[in-house]
Amino acid sequence: MIRASAIQRTAMLLRQLRGFSTSATLADKIKVKNPIVELDGDEMTRIIWQKIKDQLILPYLDVDLKYYDLGIESRDATDDQITIDAANAIKEYGVGVKCATITPDEARVKEFHLKKMWLSPNGTIRNILGGTVFRESIIIPCIPRLIPGWEKPIVIGRHAFGDQYKATDLVINEPGRLELRFTPASGGEAQTQKVYDYTGPGVGLAMYNTDESITGFAHASFKMALAKGLPLYMSTKNTILKKYDGRFKDIFQQIYEQDYAAEFEKQGLWYEHRLIDDMVAQMIKSKGGFVMALKNYDGDVQSDIVAQGFGSLGLMTSALMTPDGKAYEAEAAHGTVTRHYRQHQQGKETSTNSIASIFAWTRGLAQRGKLDETPDVVDFASKLEQATIDTVEVDRIMTKDLALAMGKTDRSAYVTTTEFLDAVADRLKK
């Protein structure tokens, strides 16, 4: 009997060391009805991503992960076809979770001996799926906010299409006229407008957007606001860009009145267009609790401001959602944490915040559960999020960035990358 008991204890210990809980048998795992597309990434986040999967996901879920390695070497070896395949897989299965990836610059091309300077994987995926990028901060009450008044979530919807990010720009080296010309495909008369008469060197730019993309952006934004139970504000500078930004304003208003006004009123919510400068001022003064629909550049900038205002860039989720809700991709809003990865390569201690990467998994799982109508999967995602928050809020176990945000600089105030994930795993078992 004693020997049998010792064997049982040893077996239990081995399971725990492998990252499995005592209830981790296949029969006890929660069944995820349909596949999730997993997009692996680079550097420190790649290491964290694997640990999250091994410690917090696979021990509890019976899930079919369609794996695509979007690490920079894999993208280079496949001429970036792996990114295209991954995006199409998300389109097929409906839900993807993505690790942070490197977007190579000239230095990265040399470092990895790349064939070329590959495009951003996020940009490629967005172009294939369409949709809107929504960024939302993860609120942990004990983490001081740079903007103390923010008590409720602020969700930033970024129209990730066109504008400056697909613009054509040029350097002007001599006097001359810059013109904007549109030639109809129907063969009709071309339209030409003078932009500027240069008397010396300068720069020029032309950018675009489409009614189709703006319409999709509007639908995704209204649906997100309803899903979150929050009012929606659309912000532009239509007083200056009367036709360009005015088109955004008009399309949003038309779609709201046609398709969403009744449901918004039913839920006690509202939609309003505001000038971007006025909206930013109101955002700073507010208590939070709304969705902001912003053009591409504005959304890029404001999402980082909101993240830092809530306490840390490491506490922000990012989700790409199509207007019809049939494709959804979740990821952390931060990068690959190169500086920590260099320390890891040297065998040095790291204290990297994994919370946003954990939430990439949970948000993807929650969406999968909603689509599949499997509340146990949604419930697990919620429990994992709460376990992560409680590790910081209740146990006061946190990584260095969060400790510094609380004004704590002693080494005893924070734990290593691995120790934090271990603590979350322990919390999840309770």
UniProtKB/Swiss-Prot annotation:
Gene3D superfamilies named in the record: Isopropylmalate Dehydrogenase
SMART domains: Iso_dh
Catalytic activity reported: D-threo-isocitrate + NADP(+) = 2-oxoglutarate + CO2 + NADPH
Cross-referenced PROSITE patterns: IDH_IMDH (PS00470)
Residue interval of the organelle targeting sequence: 1-27
Subcellular location, record wording: Mitochondrion
Cofactor notes: Binds 1 Mg(2+) or Mn(2+) ion per subunit.
GO BP: glyoxylate cycle; isocitrate metabolic process; NADP metabolic process; tricarboxylic acid cycle
Binding annotation for Mn(2+): 277, 300
Keyword NADP: yes
Residues binding substrate, per UniProt: 103, 120-126, 135, 158
Keyword terms, alphabetized: Glyoxylate bypass, Magnesium, Manganese, Metal-binding, Mitochondrion, NADP, Oxidoreductase, Transit peptide, Tricarboxylic acid cycle
EC number: 1.1.1.42
One GO CC term, this protein: mitochondrion
GO molecular function term, any single one: magnesium ion binding
SUPFAM superfamilies: Isocitrate/Isopropylmalate dehydrogenase-like (SSF53659)
Binding site for NADP(+): 101-103, 108, 285, 335-340, 353
Cofactor: Mg(2+); Mn(2+)
Sites annotated Critical for catalysis: 165, 237
Family: Belongs to the isocitrate and isopropylmalate dehydrogenases family.
Function text: Mitochondrial IDP1 may regulate flux through the tricarboxylic acid cycle and respiration. Its probably critical function is the production of NADPH.
Subunit structure: Homodimer.
Protein name, entry field: Isocitrate dehydrogenase [NADP], mitochondrial
Organism: Candida tropicalis (Yeast)
Gene responsible for this protein: IDP1
